[in-house]
């Protein structure tokens, strides 16, 4: 435990060096990091293969754990995009002069040290560092033991780049040892860590929220819905449903439940037809089951149970239910949704407006799949996570969400009466 505490102290000490680091140096470091990551593709894949060998390929985490040359290139491009974005730190948010001549300035500043606890997602290691570094924060990483080989090689590349290019302390990033003890230490590192952000499934997020003694921003699980309205376009709907469900089933913005207006049940087979090609299992309520049983493969069609709705599948599985009205659809989402991403397919402006106003989620879509809930797609570069809470940050969290603010008060000897 003392060894972990020493890491906390060193990171806390190192973060002060960023306050005087020019943005040009930060950007040069990020560009160099992207180049070095791509140059080390073969080494990274070798280490990643060790992690993959220990995991069952049928595990939903397997796809998130797996790195490829294409994915490494995409991660590097994300780092480069972060380098092109303006730093939020030091930005003047407001200014005022009080009647006594005292000047008040509200300035954005980094949190300081951010702790990230995440599962088998080695891409998070690089994404988090890039965003923390650009926004003026140091970071302490607690990755899942499933990705330990991958994370260690990536942190090694980051630290060497910090030393070689920026001549900064390698303790601007630290990777904690595998195991629950280091995770618990991080959750209780009050005085060393300013903020904890968990990235993973519901179990991890609940554990962090219930045990942390320092502030937490939840990047919650995604139970995402598409509601096909009575005035929805079938071609758009079929494309949106398939993209939202099958583009990457293991991510939090993937579709979990299709809600269809009862007046459009005759179109249900067409809306779901593309899912057959990806062997998506459908768990349908009784009404929808009867409309699908003559067209959807019997081995892929199942009756919904009481546990079906509200489940984040992270797999080639999807729930289907029908509602009488848009109000009933919104009510269903309010009960079973997680506040992540929700979509309506409709050509009716009034229906779209109602859905946008009444659905309580971080991201609400009209005729666009939930798969777009992503920092890169929102123009934020990489993302540190997708917040499903309402305080401080909501939705994809980029650079701006990694800053808070402080007040600068300047005067000439004024005293309060």
From Swiss-Prot:
<dbReference type="InterPro" id="IPR012134">
    <property type="entry name" value="Glu-5-SA_DH"/>
</dbReference>
<keyword id="KW-0963">Cytoplasm</keyword>
<comment type="function">
    <text>Catalyzes the NADPH-dependent reduction of L-glutamate 5-phosphate into L-glutamate 5-semialdehyde and phosphate. The product spontaneously undergoes cyclization to form 1-pyrroline-5-carboxylate.</text>
</comment>
<dbReference type="InterPro" id="IPR016162">
    <property type="entry name" value="Ald_DH_N"/>
</dbReference>
<keyword id="KW-0641">Proline biosynthesis</keyword>
<dbReference type="GO" id="GO:0050661">
    <property type="term" value="F:NADP binding"/>
</dbReference>
<dbReference type="GO" id="GO:0005737">
    <property type="term" value="C:cytoplasm"/>
</dbReference>
<dbReference type="GO" id="GO:0055129">
    <property type="term" value="P:L-proline biosynthetic process"/>
</dbReference>
<comment type="similarity">
    <text>Belongs to the gamma-glutamyl phosphate reductase family.</text>
</comment>
<protein>
    <recommendedName>
        <fullName>Gamma-glutamyl phosphate reductase</fullName>
        <ecNumber>1.2.1.41</ecNumber>
    </recommendedName>
</protein>
<keyword id="KW-0560">Oxidoreductase</keyword>
<dbReference type="InterPro" id="IPR016161">
    <property type="entry name" value="Ald_DH/histidinol_DH"/>
</dbReference>
<keyword id="KW-0028">Amino-acid biosynthesis</keyword>
<dbReference type="GO" id="GO:0004350">
    <property type="term" value="F:glutamate-5-semialdehyde dehydrogenase activity"/>
</dbReference>
<dbReference type="InterPro" id="IPR016163">
    <property type="entry name" value="Ald_DH_C"/>
</dbReference>
<dbReference type="InterPro" id="IPR000965">
    <property type="entry name" value="GPR_dom"/>
</dbReference>
<keyword id="KW-0521">NADP</keyword>
<comment type="pathway">
    <text>Amino-acid biosynthesis; L-proline biosynthesis; L-glutamate 5-semialdehyde from L-glutamate: step 2/2.</text>
</comment>
